[in-house]
């Protein structure tokens, strides 16, 4: 600290020591650090208070609207928008099961067979349905007469037999006689649908057919061509191809050759 001290004389001649306090950049005193910390704390508190006020402003502070007692819809008037609340869906009512009480085991078997017949009636033919109705009536009478004395094994066998009969039947929408009549009608319609050729059609077909020249004309055409070719060959090689003999006048001399076979 000696360099910051200097001595000077006062008016009375006393020597006083004075200290020069210089401002050093980057150095803080305790009072300045405390003031900066207090300012930072104040800013943080102000920011948290502002965020709290903003969050409270976004919440629906006022709700305007009424809810109907009968479960109807209502409107909620919020500060920013209006919200529509739909009524809750009513729970589906439970379907009451229909239970048919049978008087005895025979009636129960007949009802079971009738239910099976109704399930398979959509795919069975009319003839099969009539036969099944007759057999069902007979079986129901027998079941009513001796339902108490029929063992369980025979009942299961009869039920399996009925199921087998229903499976073995082939669905058909026409009787055999109707099918044969329909096929004959279709065949007759196809035969009748073929139109007979008329005179104009026959003449048109005749005109479109290629015309073939007669045999005499064809023979005359090829004979003229063969004659011209024979004349050209005789003039060039002094040989008559029609008769098969050489000609005297010419530059070629023809010599007969005896074949080995002869």
Curated annotation (Swiss-Prot):
| GO cellular component assignments | nucleus
Annotated Gene3D superfamilies: p27 (4.10.365.10)
Q: Give GO BP annotations, semicolon-separated.
A: cell division; regulation of cell cycle
- Low complexity bias spans: 198-208
Kindly summarize what the UniProt induction comment says about this protein's expression: Down-regulated by cytokinin.
**Keyword line:** Cell cycle, Cell division, Mitosis, Protein kinase inhibitor
Q: What is this protein called?
A: Cyclin-dependent kinase inhibitor 1
Stretch forming the signal peptide: none
Task: Report, as the record phrases it, the tissue specificity of this protein.
Answer: Expressed in roots, stems, leaves and apex.
Q: Which family does the record claim for this protein?
A: Belongs to the CDI family. ICK/KRP subfamily.
Which GO-annotated molecular functions does the record name? Answer: cyclin-dependent protein serine/threonine kinase inhibitor activity
Spell out the Basic and acidic residues composition-biased ranges.
160-169
Q: What does this protein do?
A: Regulates the production of endosperm cells, affecting seed filling and embryo development. Regulates endoreduplication of endosperm cells. May play a role in the exit from the mitotic cell cycle during rice grain formation. Inhibitis leaf elongation rates by decreasing cell number, that is partly compensated by increased cell size. May not affect growth rate or cell size of the primary root.
